[in-house]
């Protein structure tokens, strides 16, 4: 896994992992009811303990136990709601797809699966526990993609407008790492509530300007989506980030703290944690063709994989034509009619597993069957070429940037809607009851 991804996992993902892996406490109780599901006190306790341990190892200051507990409960609530949604629509990550994901992670780390397993177990986690946590992470990613993607529309006018801007900027990309703190206000707030939130935001801003640690302050004070990660968003192009960020940081420099900025959800404080510039010169494109089979109640995962393996054997033996097989069997409507041809494309435009597989192939080589979010594939890399960034590339890039920005915004809207429609009851410990 790339270094940046490891950083993202440092507090939250590792905490979630250890939460699900820890042995049950001898005495436990229901701390939160979410629809027909529950969060046990042991889940909260284990996650809080892990966050504290990770913070101590990183020499990071944490807020009060109550503030940290609130953030942990909120994250667990959102996780459980998403997993409940996945269960309702029948979304399951099978072992074959999980194995493929683990193989891809090992390739990114340039190790074998056995070496990766040895490293994980040396850190005190069984490989079976790691697999189940990874299964949950993949499920969360899938349910977010399924539910949020259909809410997003990118118009030709938006694309052409951004293409023009990109061309005016000479394809110069600058990425920002943003720190974000949200002092939330309720729906339809009173003037007193607005004034109170505004005062709290000014106090937080003053503390930050006086040198308080941003991450610790965010964990203690923020109601934003990245609060438990210290309010830190990963590097984003200005066209990818939420509109609120983009409107205020275009002229900011590293270290600047901006705010408070009022919106419908509250008062925002934004810090430019870091910046980096990207210079694009030549772009490598690939020409490929593939066959896609989608598992279903009729076609099992094993059967789909076996069919593709059989197709490959026939093609390699000269007994079948790849293009004809693609036309007859492929379930990708966009390419099946063209014999599976995907044409020339920037490989980063594909889903990660597809991109990684193409990167591992020589020209003319066929892949073995592999799994992506779309189903099971075999792909042939026909050719590679270096090309300047063309107008079509700019258009694809513009669509990608706009989509990512809207995805980030719609993801938070979807989570908020799910939470507002759910039955949630937080049961306080007896020691805190009046």
From Swiss-Prot:
SUPFAM superfamilies tied to this protein: FKBP-like, Triger factor/SurA peptide-binding domain-like
EC primary class: isomerase
Described function: Chaperone involved in the correct folding and assembly of outer membrane proteins. Recognizes specific patterns of aromatic residues and the orientation of their side chains, which are found more frequently in integral outer membrane proteins. May act in both early periplasmic and late outer membrane-associated steps of protein maturation.
Domain remark text: The PPIase activity resides only in the second parvulin domain. The N-terminal region and the C-terminal tail are necessary and sufficient for the chaperone activity of SurA. The PPIase activity is dispensable for SurA to function as a chaperone. The N-terminal region and the C-terminal tail are also required for porin recognition.
Principal subcellular localization: periplasm
Stated name of the protein: Chaperone SurA
Reactions catalysed: [protein]-peptidylproline (omega=180) = [protein]-peptidylproline (omega=0)
Residue stretches spanning the membrane: none
Example of a GO cellular component annotation carried by this entry: outer membrane-bounded periplasmic space
Protein keywords: Chaperone, Isomerase, Periplasm, Repeat, Rotamase, Signal
Example of a GO MF term: peptidyl-prolyl cis-trans isomerase activity
Signal peptide: 1-22
